[in-house]
UniProtKB/Swiss-Prot annotation:
The glycine cleavage system is composed of four proteins: P, T, L and H. This is Aminomethyltransferase. The gene is gcvT. InterPro entries: GCS_T (IPR006223), GCS_T_bac (IPR022903), GCST_C (IPR013977), GCV_T_N (IPR006222), GcvT/YgfZ/DmdA (IPR028896), GcvT/YgfZ_C (IPR029043), TrmE/GcvT_dom1 (IPR027266). The lineage of its organism: Bacteria, Pseudomonadati, Pseudomonadota, Betaproteobacteria, Burkholderiales. It holds the Pfam family GCV_T_C. It comes from Cupriavidus metallidurans (strain ATCC 43123 / DSM 2839 / NBRC 102507 / CH34) (Ralstonia metallidurans).
């Protein structure tokens, strides 16, 4: 099978990146030391090519009403142009089709950013709901392989770390209006050289920074300018350890179509209080929360916490969904789905290669803004 490539593929290869098949995409896992890339984001600034993710623009006079029924979070929280919202998109059984970010620009114009591996299915689902509801919303993918020929294609670069925002301003003074943005807000600026740039104060690392949605034809120049400003390239390996430390779920690993968001630590993204109906609401109300989603820290030596390992608790068995060695904590950490009544501080046993090692249940996240929140 031929892998898909982002517009930055040649640059990754020129930098000597180790490339891997990531859900059908040829992506950099690291450019040398994964730990150094991780630490650069925690201490300074790093950048990630996330152009495999897909921007989907929604337009039309009924766009807000359509999203009210489509998403589990309350779209009516978005009243100020540029405001962003994290939400799950569910099926009728309450399973997670995808997790995404939705941006509000105007009453007839919203933007979704969806995961790479789910993009085709997401678009098909959104279109099917559009047809079923007669909403008349125009759905426009902007990723290179999915965008209509008449539409400009977009790429995404995430610049993350305590110095990330300043280094973006240094590289592109046109982005200075973003300096007043609060987290989960975005602004669109025009750069004389690079064109229209959407600058969003969002990320997937637990650090401050921006996600830049940019013209695909200009993303190589943007990457090079950021590099010249001292932003270090980082690959999928560091992205995974950073998001795990930050307590951020990965679709397909920590939740999927067979998982309720209530059992994936995502209750805060689900609006069950208002009278608004949405796809999957009835199923969630009927099932309620069945499991606890929590962090684990391995206390015994001799192993690393990994996905699918069994967790033995006083209330029954659970399972690790994601696990890694944390560079920031120098400990093995994980997410686990556990029996509902298991509380932080509980000691559990994890089966690792026919051994049972002790771990402690902790509240997520492990690290935020460079500071350890657990011990």
């Amino acid at each position: 099978m031929t892998l898909q490539a982002t517009p930055l593929n040649a640059i990754h290869r020129a930098l000597g990146a180790r490339m891997v098949d990531f859900g059908g995409w040829d992506m950099p896992v690291n450019y040398g030391s994964q730990i150094e890339e991780h630490n650069a984001v925690r201490a300074d600034a790093g950048m990630f090519d996330v152009s495999h993710m897909c921007v989907v623009d929604l337009s039309g006079i009924h766009a807000r009403a359509f999203l009210r029924g489509l998403l589990a979070n309350n779209i009516d929280k978005l009243q100020t142009p540029g405001k962003a919202l994290y939400s799950c998109m569910l099926d009728e059984k309450g399973g997670v089709i995808d997790d995404l970010i939705v941006y509000f620009f105007a009453e007839d114009r919203f933007r979704l950013v969806v995961n790479a591996s789910t993009a085709v299915g997401d678009i098909e689902w959104i279109q099917s709901r559009n047809t079923a509801t007669g909403s008349g919303v125009t759905i426009t993918p902007r990723r290179g392989d999915l965008a209509p020929a008449c539409v400009s294609k977009l790429a995404i670069v995430a610049v993350q770390g305590p110095n990330a925002r300043q280094k973006v301003y240094d590289a592109f003074p046109s982005t200075q209006p973003a300096d007043t943005l609060k987290p989960f807000n975005a602004v669109v600026v025009h750069d004389a050289e690079m064109g229209e740039l959407m600058v969003a104060r969002t990320g997937y690392t637990g650090e401050d920074g921006f996600e830049l949605v940019v013209p695909a034809e200009n993303v190589a120049g943007i990457w090079e300018k950021l590099s010249a400003s001292g932003v270090r390239p980082a690959g999928l390996g560091a992205r995974d350890t950073l998001r795990l430390e930050a307590g951020m779920n990965l679709y397909g690993q920590d939740m999927d179509i067979h998982t309720s968001p209530l059992d994936a630590g995502l209750s805060w993204t689900v609006d069950l209080q208002s009278e608004r109906d949405f796809i999957g609401k009835s199923a969630l109300l009927a099932s309620g929360q069945q499991k606890t989603f929590a962090g684990l820290i391995l206390r015994d030596k001799g192993g690393v916490l990994r996905a699918h390992q069994k967790v033995i608790t006083p209330a029954g068995d659970g399972e690790i969904t994601s696990g890694t060695f944390s560079p920031s904590l120098s400990q093995s950490i994980a997410f686990a789905r556990l029996p509902r009544d298991i509380a932080p501080g509980t000691e559990v046993q994890v089966e690792i290669r026919d051994r049972k090692l002790t771990a402690t249940v902790v509240k997520l996240p492990f690290v935020r803004n460079g500071k350890a929140l657990v011990s």
